[in-house]
């Protein structure tokens, strides 16, 4: 009996050690499974990030993807031009050359016939080029913060000859610039730094609807919240009395201080910094923030002020907001995501008691 008891006593510590090792292994494995929730107001750059993750961490776009995005490029381009033409009468702007009226009618007819996803005919391409070169159209484009216009409009309209070529095939950059409204939940899986990522883009989601599903994501590792810096002087599509950045601030407040995300890391992506840097020279930040009193609209100071406004929404003394400024440039976002991943690894291991 004494020998048996002694053997049991000796076995107990080793069993406990095995349990500890098993718990540690499970913790390490759990720390390797990363769920990221992508949130932000409409047109804040969420879909672009999903596409960039596909380029960086998967095999990029397939031949079928390139084929499917071709009509999207055509539609985005002509719809952007139409948005400018429609805004001209509202803003009291006329064509510099009256001959452009017939060109405008041709473009409107294409939309009326729902042929905006078709390749441009030679006549249509020539009309679009003449319209884009018209001084009146350019004046209206310069006031695009006063109406709704895709921020990729200039990118595509400046390159009409390439888009209008008979053998045109979209580039990766073209696909990144396209705008397709996200419906439902988009899920992307990829591996990076020995981690297994699941990235969820839940689209726009009305505030009233958000309450119904937000708790389903309480176990996410981190939230990436996207803000379009360049939209500080624009209003919402659905409510043209509400400033887009002010709406983003409200949404960020509701997410950052949500009871479901008390222990969730929050990464703030201030997107479209390239467009913001260009716009801040001519459109004052006071449109969104009247209290911003700098006489000279300098990019660095203005960007820092926007960042401070979002960070000030954090009511927690223990939660840290990890902020990064990003552009449409994939190389820039690869560097940013690399830094973000290091933060996620450290926080996840710490949460499992392994760091």
Curated annotation (Swiss-Prot):
Disulfide bond sites: none
GO cellular component, one term: cytoplasm
An example Gene Ontology biological process: adenylate cyclase-modulating G protein-coupled receptor signaling pathway
Family membership: Belongs to the G-alpha family. G(i/o/t/z) subfamily.
Pfam family, one: G-alpha
Start-end of Low complexity biased regions: 1-17
Occurrences of domain G-alpha (ranges): 32-355
Location of the region described as G2 motif in the Swiss-Prot/TrEMBL record: 174-182
UniProt binding sites for Mg(2+): 47, 182
Lipid attachment in record (N-myristoyl glycine): 2
Subunit structure: G proteins are composed of 3 units; alpha, beta and gamma. The alpha chain contains the guanine nucleotide binding site.
SMART domains xref list: G_alpha
Residue segments, region G1 motif: 35-48
Protein name: Guanine nucleotide-binding protein G(o) subunit alpha
Natural source organism: Manduca sexta
